[in-house]
């Protein structure tokens, strides 16, 4: 009698139901594809929990990617996406659920509402079984694809809540002073909540008007995580090089920047851009040349920083080394190799003069 009395008493003082469900290695693993739906028993579990209680429910989902949640998400009061957190995952999740840690994670992907909404849906299945798939989405994957289609998503790229709130204000864009940076973007982030926490400020760039190629509405170009105490404010600064405005031109075998207007937006996710400024790039820049770029002129084509790249046909009278933004990084004379000391990670194009002929090559510092 006392046991049952205690049990029912305990049941009625529960503040929150924590429902843990999702996938494991039996339903989601390398070497196979799972369905977008939850495993049937897992969906049955969360459905029963929802039907049996009016107590607030917090869902904890273990999965390596998005799942169909239209049938149950509206009944949850909170959702913690655990991914696969490892052997200490229980400790980490407990600290988040009980408020010892203020979460600040952001989604690295977009969570669609339906699998058919995904930009890669039409190229995922080999419907005619000819072992040939057309990747028709091109660069319009993830949030770029949803911007293009206008589909409403479940949770956008870069989304994530915490136990506090933040505000962005006072955005400015001004010329930058530096070797590579051309613009400096500054905004002010304030913790407007009651607990300390971190926020990830995200910066997106979008070309306005026409371009030689079809381009996304916006693209993530920079982000910073900032930790603030309650009521604290901090200036958040981004430096943008020409890379932030460039695209690869196949005809020119180089990254180029179109002249014209661009929107620079900052916010907390791909769908929560709170501040925006328009800038104008007045002239095209970058390595624009009608000379064919042949990587075989330089060997090896991929090197560690500090190693040398050999010029395959011997000594050249002159070699100019540029990064992909068109910034000159080195002038070399009467040389048969390109030293990479002082070069950062990335691709470089070399303009060489051989017997009064101009030849280009390229290499990568990894």
Summary of predicted features, one role per range:
Residues 285-366:
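C-terminal outer-membrane/trafficking sorting elements
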Residues 1, 7-302, 325:
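C-terminal non-catalytic regions of proteins with extracellular/luminal or membrane-system context
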């Amino acid at each position: 009698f006392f046991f049952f009395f205690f049990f029912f008493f305990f049941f009625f003082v529960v503040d929150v139901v924590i429902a843990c469900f999702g996938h494991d290695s039996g339903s989601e693993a390398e070497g196979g594809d799972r369905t977008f739906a939850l495993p049937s028993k897992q969906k049955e579990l969360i459905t029963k929990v929802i039907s049996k209680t009016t107590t607030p429910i917090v869902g904890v989902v273990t999965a390596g990617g998005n799942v169909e949640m239209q049938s149950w998400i509206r009944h949850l009061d909170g959702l913690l996406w655990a991914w696969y957190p490892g052997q200490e995952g229980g400790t980490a999740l407990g600290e988040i659920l009980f408020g010892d840690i203020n979460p600040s994670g952001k989604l690295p992907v977009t969570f669609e509402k339906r699998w058919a909404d995904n930009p890669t849906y039409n190229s995922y299945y080999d419907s005619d079984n000819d072992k040939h798939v057309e990747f028709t989405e091109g660069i319009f994957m993830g949030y770029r694809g949803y911007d293009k289609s206008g589909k409403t998503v479940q949770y956008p790229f870069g989304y994530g809540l915490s136990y506090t709130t933040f505000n962005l204000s006072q955005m400015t864009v001004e010329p930058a002073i530096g070797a590579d940076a051309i613009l400096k973007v500054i905004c002010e982030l304030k913790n407007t909540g009651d607990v300390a926490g971190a926020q990830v400020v995200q910066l997106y760039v979008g070309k306005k008007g026409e371009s030689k190629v079809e381009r996304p509405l916006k693209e993530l170009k920079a982000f910073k995580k900032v930790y603030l105490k309650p009521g604290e404010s901090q200036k958040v600064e981004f430096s943008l090089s020409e890379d932030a405005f460039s695209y690869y031109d196949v005809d020119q075998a180089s990254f180029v920047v179109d002249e014209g207007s661009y929107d620079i937006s900052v916010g907390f996710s791909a769908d929560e851009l709170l501040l925006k400024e328009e800038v104008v790039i007045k002239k095209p820049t970058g390595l624009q040349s009608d000379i064919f770029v042949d990587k075989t002129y330089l060997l090896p084509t991929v090197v560690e920083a500090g190693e040398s790249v050999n010029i395959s046909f011997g000594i050249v009278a002159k070699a100019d080394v540029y990064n992909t933004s068109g910034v000159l990084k080195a002038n070399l004379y009467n040389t048969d190799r390109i030293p990479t000391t002082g070069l950062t990670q990335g691709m470089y194009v070399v303009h060489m003069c051989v017997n009064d002929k101009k030849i280009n090559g390229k290499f990568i510092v990894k």
